[in-house]
Regions:
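Non-catalytic substrate/cofactor recognition surfaces at enzyme active-site rims
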Residues: 1-181
Length: 181
């Protein structure tokens, strides 16, 4: 029986007690290690400029939508019909030379990696599930659309639009934000 369940019966089992104690010790050790590493990094950080440019911008992009017409789990091809276009909200926060792109949906990692590659700024990152929730579901990168994973099957976006729209949209916001001094 799972020792984490309420009212578990193995509570008096010495093997379970030993394993639970080991888990507590490991969690404590990891916490101490993390705390020491944070202190080490903090000591090495040079104080930066006190006045850096700060800017924010937002826009929407729209991509063709789809509606799934069959049921099934991962591993089986989905069938779809055309649906209303899906709006995706994009944002950007600039703090000095750091660019933080934002998307209001859960974006596959290759899209964020592409943004970082194409960004003219060395310090570029992407946050997701930001500024509300898109009705898109997951947003796969173009290459992933051929895979029958739950995330791809459940996406309400047709292939071939969202990846480029997101990357180009955030790069456009960077162009706007770079003019702020």
């Amino acid at each position: 029986m799972n020792a984490a369940r309420r009212g578990f019966k193995d509570g008096n089992d010495p093997v379970v007690a030993r394993l639970m104690n080991q888990q507590r010790q490991m969690a404590t050790s990891m916490g101490q290690f993390l705390g020491e590493e944070v202190l080490y990094v903090m000591r090495g950080i040079a104080r930066g400029d006190s006045a850096v440019p700060i800017a924010a911008a937002a826009t929407n992009v729209s991509c063709p939508g789809r509606e799934r017409t069959n049921e099934g789990r991962a591993g089986f091809e989905g069938t779809y019909k055309d649906a209303a276009p899906v709006d995706i909200r994009l944002g950007l926060l600039r703090v000095g030379d750091v660019m933080i792109g934002a998307v209001n949906a859960e974006v596959f990692n290759p899209i964020a990696q592409r943004l970082k590659r194409e960004s003219p700024f060395k310090a570029t990152m992407m946050t997701t599930l930001t500024n509300g929730s898109a009705r898109s579901g997951y947003i796969p990168d173009d290459e992933s659309y051929g895979k029958y994973t739950f995330e791809v099957l459940s996406s309400r976006l047709k292939p071939g639009c969202a990846e480029t729209a997101i990357v180009n949209g955030i790069l456009g916001l960077m162009d706007t934000a770079r003019r702020v001094n």
